[in-house]
């Protein structure tokens, strides 16, 4: 019985390790895509969204509603 569990563990562990080494480029691309999407949906105040005469504060603040210009 112990031998069965040992073989099961080795087979699962080796497939997990091999799967991780094969999928590294795919995971790297997915992580980069997530980072790009986060930058595109940046919640901080953007100067180009402010109406004329108003500006973003010097300290970056996250905007929940609207462009948050002062």
From Swiss-Prot:
The family classification in the record reads: Belongs to the scoloptoxin-07 family.
- Single GO MF descriptor: toxin activity
**Tissue expression per record:** Expressed by the venom gland.
Q: Which UniProt keywords apply?
A: Cleavage on pair of basic residues, Disulfide bond, Ion channel impairing toxin, Neurotoxin, Potassium channel impairing toxin, Secreted, Signal, Toxin, Voltage-gated potassium channel impairing toxin
Cellular component terms (Gene Ontology): extracellular region
Know the name of this protein? Kappa-scoloptoxin(07)-Ssm2b
* Residue spans crossing the bilayer: none
Q: What does the UniProt PTM comment say about this protein?
A: Contains 3 disulfide bonds.
Task: Give the subcellular location.
Answer: Secreted
Q: What is its main location?
A: secreted
- What job does this protein perform? Inhibits voltage-gated potassium channels.
UniProt keyword Secreted, yes or no: yes
Q: Which classification does the entry list for the species?
A: Eukaryota, Metazoa, Ecdysozoa, Arthropoda, Myriapoda
| Propiece residues | 20-39
Which positions carry the signal peptide feature in this UniProt record?
1-19
